[in-house]
Amino acid sequence: MPDYAVEATNIVRTFAAGNVRALDGVSLQVPTGQVFGLLGPNGSGKTTMVRILSTILSPSSGSATVAGFDVVKQPNQVRRHIGLAGQNATVDENLTGFENLRMVGLLNHLNKPYVVAKSQQLLEDFGLADAANRITKTYSGGMRRRLDLAAALVASPPILFLDEPTTGLDPQSRQDLWAIIERLVEGGTT
């Protein structure tokens, strides 16, 4: 892994035929193994920046690398090195919690025994083991959010993007999430 897990130089992103400038020359460097937060008011472009760094959007101009790979020219390599939990939980409500995590692992071409063990571990870590075999449409909003965060970790990515990770979590779940993040950072996750 390079010295910087994430580097961005003069990122500009416009919408509505160039009339709305969501990002205007953002540059940043995130050292490998460090926690980095984007702070700003609503509508300041934080989510847009995360979407660019995770290859969901392309910048209008500027350049960025994640794990040493260009987000525009090498999006598949970037995706192999990241986990992403967006602002809203994106779980399949017709699958169980376990099936959601297993699906993510298999889509990442991970071997089945690893996926089963990792899914069970994450369900336990996020306080969802008792609900592992329930259809997720029966989950509360906070439970869905925790499952979404767990899904971002199935592939044990070296870089993790969390967009407002504590939204919808109760105080105990927030504390538990920060403890998990601390353990990940201690293990080298950026």
Where is each model-derived feature located?
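Catalytic Walker B motif of ABC-type/P-loop ATPase nucleotide-binding domains
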Residues: 160-163
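Walker A (P-loop) phosphate-binding loop of ABC-type ATPase nucleotide-binding domains
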Residues: 41-45
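Conserved catalytic motifs of ABC-family nucleotide-binding domains
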Residues: 156
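Conserved ABC ATPase "signature" region
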Residues: 102, 106, 113-131
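Helical segment within the ABC ATPase nucleotide-binding domain
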Residues: 175-187
